[in-house]
């Protein structure tokens, strides 16, 4: 049960210009994660899936934007982003990761 929960923690890598620069310069991977997880869950999931050692994890909630089309106003969902700082000597290739 616990292993199944850890496999559902990471939704996808967050690919942006800022995240690719952080990966190149500071060895930081940026992930979209499920809203209810803690730093410890993210740590266990990343260590288990990628076989790396983690130095630090920063987590933040990204608020959904309001989007409208003519007279209809809607909102995008809130989501959680995790910045995972890896120890020296460890790398993760997120671009060639299979779903």
Swiss-Prot record:
InterPro entries: Nucleotide-bd_a/b_plait_sf, Ribosomal_uL23-like, Ribosomal_uL23/eL15/eS24_sf
Pfam annotation, one family: Ribosomal_L23
SUPFAM superfamilies the UniProt entry points to: Ribosomal proteins S24e, L23 and L15e
GO cellular component term, pick one: ribonucleoprotein complex
Molecular function GO labels: rRNA binding; structural constituent of ribosome
Alphabetized UniProt keyword annotations: Ribonucleoprotein, Ribosomal protein, RNA-binding, rRNA-binding
Keyword Plastid in record: no
Quaternary structure, from the entry: Part of the 50S ribosomal subunit. Contacts protein L29, and trigger factor when it is bound to the ribosome.
Listed name of the protein: Large ribosomal subunit protein uL23
Family the entry assigns: Belongs to the universal ribosomal protein uL23 family.
Record function comment: One of the early assembly proteins it binds 23S rRNA. One of the proteins that surrounds the polypeptide exit tunnel on the outside of the ribosome. Forms the main docking site for trigger factor binding to the ribosome.
GO biological process: translation
Encoding gene, per UniProt annotation: rplW
Highest rank taxon of the organism: Bacteria
